[in-house]
């Protein structure tokens, strides 16, 4: 017998799932923000959280709670917008779940079950932040962070690597061995390009000395692997690098799967700087050369997206993060970004707007005197027009 509370809660959830999502008044000429998040913990199906049987759950208590839904890979599949979200339980363990809609800004509903991804080893503790790539070899690849216990007395220590799985339908997944980078002890925030480069699988990487600190890792790397089923990268060339007193001073990493455009590979990434209140994550972009994807050919100064209003507050405040974007046939770009490790939003731009932003916004001049000069030059040109 189903508990009567289920019907009440199901009706409330249906109203949430069916609500319209409208643009806000926010304006910068680059992208539009939307009023509501596209995914939250309230979007999770009730039968994932509650035992619906009144006999075994007379008080209708939540048995397997959900803490947050955020950081989602994204792909257009069978004319539907599909998100592979990071879902975090009350027990802190993350798992992947597919939500889909026929619209890119609203109406996302989770499939009947989450993704059942097998572990490769017994010490694999957590998985999260999947990037999705529709590769020219015919497979959809998911590249994600795998967290393993370091097996030491310090419980805060862990080892991060890049896991790889592939699918044709986002339902049935084949787990492949983790990516091996011979010159980097740890990896996370890895993306796979959708095309072969010199006949090899091409990755943007993030070399790390430790689980949290990048150490000697200078920024976002680029490397090639001969075989995706046993992916090994020897050399990593640096692309977008960390710089002092910028949005990437502490660390940076790849975000959404790179987007191929006529002018280059459009990369939507994240940068991190330290503050008195902790790490601040923002989203920025850069463009790499089509034939030599390790060469940065445009990198505007500052951030593209930063925490705004209510986005500033959550489990890990003052953070925005992306690992998924979808490009429509008309050139519209849906950037799915999480705020404060709690919920998932969408910003909508276009290829033309993002390329204009990337190539025509001044690069970071790195010093206050030069940055003020950039601004004064803009002011002077505008005054001449007024």
Swiss-Prot record:
Q: Recite the other comments.
A: Both RaMP1 and RaMP2 (Rumal_0099) catalyze the phosphorolysis of a beta-1,4-mannosidic linkage at the non-reducing end of a substrate, but acceptor specificities are clearly different.
* InterPro entries, A to Z: Glyco_hydro_beta-prop_sf, Man_Glc_phosphorylase, Mannoside_phosphorylase
Question: What is the enzyme's main class?
Answer: transferase
Q: Does the keyword S-adenosyl-L-methionine apply?
A: no
What organism is listed for this UniProt entry?
Ruminococcus albus (strain ATCC 27210 / DSM 20455 / JCM 14654 / NCDO 2250 / 7)
Temperature remarks: Optimum temperature is 50 degrees Celsius.
Q: Which GO terms describe its molecular function?
A: hexosyltransferase activity
Instruction: Name the protein family.
Output: Belongs to the glycosyl hydrolase 130 family.
Q: How does activity depend on pH?
A: Optimum pH is 6.5.
Q: Which Pfam family, giving just one, matches this sequence? A: Glyco_hydro_130
Function of the protein: Converts 4-O-beta-D-mannopyranosyl-D-glucopyranose (Man-Glc) to mannose 1-phosphate (Man1P) and glucose. Involved in a mannan catabolic pathway which feeds into glycolysis.
Q: What is this protein called?
A: 4-O-beta-D-mannosyl-D-glucose phosphorylase
Subunit structure as annotated in this protein's UniProt entry = Homodimer in solution.
The record's Gene Ontology biological-process terms are:
carbohydrate metabolic process; cell wall organization
> What chemistry does it catalyse, as a reaction equation?
4-O-beta-D-mannopyranosyl-D-glucopyranose + phosphate = alpha-D-mannose 1-phosphate + D-glucose
* Keywords in alphabetical order: Carbohydrate metabolism, Cell wall biogenesis/degradation, Glycosyltransferase, Transferase
Q: What is its EC number?
A: 2.4.1.281
């Amino acid at each position: 017998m189903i508990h009567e509370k289920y019907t009440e809660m199901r009706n409330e959830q249906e109203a949430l799932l069916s609500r319209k999502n409208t643009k806000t008044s926010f304006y910068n000429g680059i992208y539009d923000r939307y009023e509501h998040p596209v995914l939250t913990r309230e979007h999770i199906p009730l039968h994932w959280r509650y035992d619906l049987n009144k006999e075994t759950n007379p008080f209708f208590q939540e048995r397997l709670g959900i803490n947050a839904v955020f950081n989602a890979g994204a792909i257009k599949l069978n004319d539907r917008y599909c998100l592979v979200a990071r879902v975090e339980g009350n027990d802190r363990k993350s798992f992947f779940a597919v939500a889909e809609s026929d619209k890119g800004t609203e109406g996302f509903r989770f499939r009947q079950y989450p993704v059942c991804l097998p572990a490769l080893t017994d010490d694999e503790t957590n998985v999260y932040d999947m990037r999705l790539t529709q590769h020219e070899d015919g497979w959809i690849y998911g590249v994600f962070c795998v967290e393993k216990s370091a097996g030491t007395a310090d419980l805060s220590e862990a080892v991060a690597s890049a896991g790889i799985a592939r699918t044709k339908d986002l339902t049935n997944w084949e787990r492949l061995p983790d990516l091996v980078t011979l010159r980097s002890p740890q990896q996370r925030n890895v993306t796979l390009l959708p095309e072969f480069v010199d006949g090899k699988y091409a990755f943007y990487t993030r070399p790390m000395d430790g689980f949290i600190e990048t150490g000697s890792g200078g920024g976002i790397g680029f490397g090639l692997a001969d075989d995706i089923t046993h992916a090994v990268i020897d050399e990593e060339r640096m692309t977008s690098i960390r710089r002092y007193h910028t949005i990437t001073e502490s660390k940076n990493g790849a975000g959404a799967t790179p987007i191929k455009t006529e002018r280059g590979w459009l990369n939507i990434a994240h940068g991190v700087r330290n503050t008195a209140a902790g790490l601040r994550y923002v989203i920025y972009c850069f463009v790499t050369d089509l034939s030599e994807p390790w060469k940065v050919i445009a990198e505007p100064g500052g951030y593209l997206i930063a925490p705004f209003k209510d986005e500033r507050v959550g489990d890990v405040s003052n953070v925005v993060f992306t690992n998924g974007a979808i490009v429509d046939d008309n050139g519209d770009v849906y950037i799915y970004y999480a705020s404060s490790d709690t919920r998932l939003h969408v910003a909508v731009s276009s290829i033309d707007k993002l390329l204009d932003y990337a190539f025509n916004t001044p690069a970071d001049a790195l010093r206050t005197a030069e940055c003020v000069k950039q601004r004064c030059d803009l002011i002077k040109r505008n005054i001449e027009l007024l």
